Amino acid sequence: MNLQIIILAAGQGKRMYSDTPKVLHHLAGKPLLTHVVETAQQLNPDAIHVIYGHGGEQIKSSLPNLPVHWVHQAEQLGTGHAVLQAMPHIPDDAYVLVLSADVPLIQVGTLQSLIECSQRQNPDHSVLALLVAELENPSGLGRIIRNNQGEIYSIVEEKDANEQVKNIKEIYSGVCCTLANNLKKWLPQLSNSNAQGEYYLTEIISLAVQNKTPITSLTAKNSFEVQGINNRQQLQQLERTWQQRAANQLMEKGATLADANRFDLRGELYCGKDVYIDINCIFTGKVVLGNGCKIGPNCSLTNVTLGDGCEVYANSVLEGCHIANDCHIGPFARLRSGTQLASHCKIGNFVETKKAIFDEGTKASHLSYLGDVLLGKNVNVGAGTITCNYDGVNKHQTIIEDGVFIGSDTQLVAPVTVGANATIGAGSTIRRNVPPDELTLTESRQKTIYGWKRPVKRERD
């Protein structure tokens, strides 16, 4: 079977009150259009056609790597007109699945069932299969009209509906599947004699009835699958729906969330056994948490891997890091891209790292900046230590070998190497390589000024 998918993404999204096209607004860390394209890809179609119009160049430039065929709708004359723009690119014998870019939570299984419905009754001549839903509040959506035999014979849009039709709770989702040859016959016959003055795709139902093409429907099991986004309130509602489902899936697999309503996933999160996640944590990109990991409140992890038994304390930010087993991080720590910790390391409060590689058992417990640095095993970095890695033009590396003890308030001016088991005295500024097994310090002699008096505040005139 040749499957062609059309995604409608040309709408202006006026009710978003935004300069950003609606389909580029984010849900769970990804643009709405990306959600729909990724779902479509799972159906293994022969092609995905995205119909763009308003803000089209911005959409294309923001999502340059989407595996789609872009089709321009120069004038936004309605959903039927939008689908018509793609038809010259689609073979007559292909099956066409029409999706909306602002309906992001449609599920693959539902779409597979709808495609099967479009073939089930008459494999040689496709039926028109519609995805419908029963909603308690169907306001704003097209209503399904059935005859006395329960057969669909029309869809009436909200703006064209009378009060009797508005009381119907069965709605059309905007998702349908049929043979391309059917669409090529029906779409040129659409009329714009309606309240909007547009060519509605829903009018193909009456044309199918006239042509005696069978119409079948599939009712979505979950109402969120057919919920569209037209304003920021609806975007927020679907965001919470997505997050609640993600939280439930994690808990079903054994993770503990302190509060599933205060959890945000903006990518992929993989948890081992007995993982604990406190409130207000954000996970972005791909995050892997090993067995027994604990994440404290208000933490942000982006593209991070944590080994077994790690604990990240409150208000810590980790990005692009690989952390081995039994490490402790925070509170208020910031680990930037390129940070790697071997097992049993500690990064304490108000420590920032960047391109820092720690070997086993190394600790930096307080108030330090460690950038472009290699640290050996069992190094102790005192409070206030800074690797001075930038000369105003280039970055330089600091190497600290095994067993080094660095006293508090030390500046290491890179490039510099500190030899194994060396000790650096507190308050030192190290500009040259430090020999192993020795004490090195830069001494400024302490002086006492006897008889010195503090200044006295002058009386004002």
UniProtKB/Swiss-Prot annotation:
Its EC number is 2.7.7.23, 2.3.1.157. Residues 1-232 are annotated as: Pyrophosphorylase. Pathway: Nucleotide-sugar biosynthesis; UDP-N-acetyl-alpha-D-glucosamine biosynthesis; N-acetyl-alpha-D-glucosamine 1-phosphate from alpha-D-glucosamine 6-phosphate (route II): step 2/2; Nucleotide-sugar biosynthesis; UDP-N-acetyl-alpha-D-glucosamine biosynthesis; UDP-N-acetyl-alpha-D-glucosamine from N-acetyl-alpha-D-glucosamine 1-phosphate: step 1/1; Bacterial outer membrane biogenesis; LPS lipid A biosynthesis. Disulfide bonds: none annotated. HAMAP family: GlmU. In the N-terminal section; belongs to the N-acetylglucosamine-1-phosphate uridyltransferase family. This is Bifunctional protein GlmU. It comes from Legionella pneumophila (strain Paris). The lineage of its organism: Bacteria, Pseudomonadati, Pseudomonadota, Gammaproteobacteria, Legionellales.
